[in-house]
Amino acid sequence: QESILRSLVGARRVAVASGNQAGKDWLNARVIIWWLLTRAPAVCIWTGPTQRQVEIVWRECRMAMTQARKPLGGTALEIPHWKLADDQYALGFSTDKPYQIQGHHNANLLAIITEAHGVDDEHYNALLRLGPKLLIVTGNPLTMQGFLHDALHQNRDLWVTHTISCLDTPNVQQKRVVIPGMMTWEDVQDRK
């Protein structure tokens, strides 16, 4: 994950292929916080195939905010919304209508698609039309079509790409639970 975070500086598009329980949502949450606290004005929007997926990222954001050494400021609501100022906020949502993505314009716009393999190309294109300064897509490479597949394969030259293997997570490497909630050695054995 460290190499992914380092690659964000100066990147325009980042695609992360990952297995289940490998830390994608943890990573996305830290990127959201970093983005808003290092730029002003700044807007971060994130979406996914379901509101539940959006709320998982939000839960990770709230946990990171709670565990921060110093208060991060702003107002963090129960819904996926963190507001530092009128022109400095993070908002997560899921929609079945691509046109509802419109309206979030900012010179420092970060757009994230979590579980991107489950989001259709129309939603991806709606996000692109916002002109994000940085676009991050994360997901399980489960399908042989769609924008995530294209980013990882035929359009790879337009993206900074990364892979997080479940086999590289601390719990699997150390064969014990180091980080609760991540893939475990037992999980890997069960799937053989």
Predicted feature descriptions by range:
Residues 1-192:
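Phosphate/NTP-binding elements of NTP-utilizing enzymes
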